[in-house]
């Protein structure tokens, strides 16, 4: 699109939205009607920076796009510009609430600029600002995500194996065998990485019955806030905090949703083991069932408790102790 025609004074604080794609990105200014675009590379970054140098920037919001946003966000941060990388679902829901029902790169960029204006006026603005991920943590995140991809592929191939075309089984079995080797190799790499960079935390977490290497890796990789935030906040980030659904005199059923699915899934698998072998979680689970809670609700509550225990251990540096952590709410 053409250059924005939005005119501002020299002292006007402006809010920028950036919509990222693999090859290009589009940016817009809150209150403008048009956007600009550039290639997603250093030359394109310089085009954006040239525009920003003419402005007094209050906040730049970039939609998280599978890591495509990291390079630009890091460049902006190094130059001292305030940057927030936001959840795509939150950004889209905000856009719809503002009446942006259609979806194009330009519309998204302007909607993100509007979102930047809103976020900048929140009391806890510091909580949304981007901070670069350390290289060793970024590497662990990449390995954990890759393992999930391989596991999903293996599940898909296993399901295909049960199909009616027996002539395909040899091919499917060969793919499964290759995937098994890839997963085993990646498990060793993840274990070595945890040993090198997260040894103490890894040991503390894996001392908890139910928490294995894969759960530990997912939690360490995608919950770096553990130990620095309250348990309730951790539960909200993962999507394990029951959220109210009330309106007027209606008191709806509370439910959990959203959050970091890769951590939530890992904790759920750990919970299935913990309700059998971890004395603290087992007693808690049985008490919930005795109180009439459905199994799914009880399991979710156990995952919530397990996360709070991990958060408390990360904060205190204490080893797993059933007598202490059994009272963690």
What are these regions (language model features)?
Residues 6-30, 112, 150, 217:
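Gly/Thr-rich phosphate-binding beta-strand-loop-beta motif of the actin/hexokinase/Hsp70
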Residues 57-68:
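Short glycine-rich phosphate-binding loop at a beta-alpha junction
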Residues 1-13, 35, 47, 56, ...:
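Intrinsically disordered, low-complexity and often Lys/Arg-enriched segments
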Residues 30-59:
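Nucleic-acid-processing active sites and adjacent nucleic-acid-binding tracks
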Residues 2, 74-77, 84-209, 217:
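Long, charge-rich intrinsically disordered scaffolds of nucleic-acid metabolism proteins
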Residues 213, 217-291, 295, 322-329:
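Phosphate-backbone recognition surface of nucleic-acid-processing proteins
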Residues 290-323:
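Charged substrate- and nucleic-acid-binding regions of tRNA-handling and nucleotidyl-transfer enzymes
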């Amino acid at each position: 699109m053409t250059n924005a025609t939005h005119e501002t004074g020299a002292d006007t604080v402006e809010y920028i939205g950036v919509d990222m794609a693999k090859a290009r990105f589009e940016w817009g200014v809150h209150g403008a009607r048009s956007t600009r675009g550039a290639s997603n590379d250093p030359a394109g970054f310089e085009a954006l920076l040239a525009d920003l140098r003419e402005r007094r920037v209050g906040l730049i919001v970039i939609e998280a796009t599978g890591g495509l946003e990291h390079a630009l966000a890091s460049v902006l941060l190094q130059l001292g510009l305030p940057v927030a990388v936001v959840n795509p679902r939150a950004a889209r829901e905000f856009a719809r609430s503002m009446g942006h029902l259609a979806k194009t790169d330009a519309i998204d960029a302007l909607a993100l600029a509007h979102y930047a204006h809103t976020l900048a006026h929140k009391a806890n603005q510091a909580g949304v600002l981007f901070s670069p991920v350390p290289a060793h943590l970024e590497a662990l995140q990449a390995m954990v995500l890759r393992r999930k991809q391989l596991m999903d592929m293996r599940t898909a191939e296993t399901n295909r194996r049960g199909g009616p075309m027996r002539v395909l089984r040899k091919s499917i079995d060969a793919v499964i065998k290759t995937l098994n080797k890839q997963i085993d190799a990646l498990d060793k790499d993840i274990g070595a990485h945890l040993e090198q960079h997260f040894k103490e935390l890894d040991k503390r977490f894996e001392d908890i019955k139910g928490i294995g290497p894969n759960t530990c890796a997912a939690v360490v990789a995608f919950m770096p806030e553990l130990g620095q935030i309250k348990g309730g906040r951790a539960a909200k980030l993962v999507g394990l905090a029951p959220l109210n659904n009330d309106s007027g005199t209606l008191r709806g059923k509370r439910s959990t949703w959203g959050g970091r699915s890769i951590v939530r899934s890992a904790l759920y698998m750990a919970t299935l083991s913990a309700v059998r072998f971890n004395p603290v979680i087992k007693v808690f689970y049985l008490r919930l069932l005795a109180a009439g809670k459905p199994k799914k609700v009880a399991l979710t509550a156990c995952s919530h408790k397990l996360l709070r225990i991990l958060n408390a251990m990360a904060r205190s540096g204490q080893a797993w102790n059933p007598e202490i952590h059994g009272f963690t709410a």
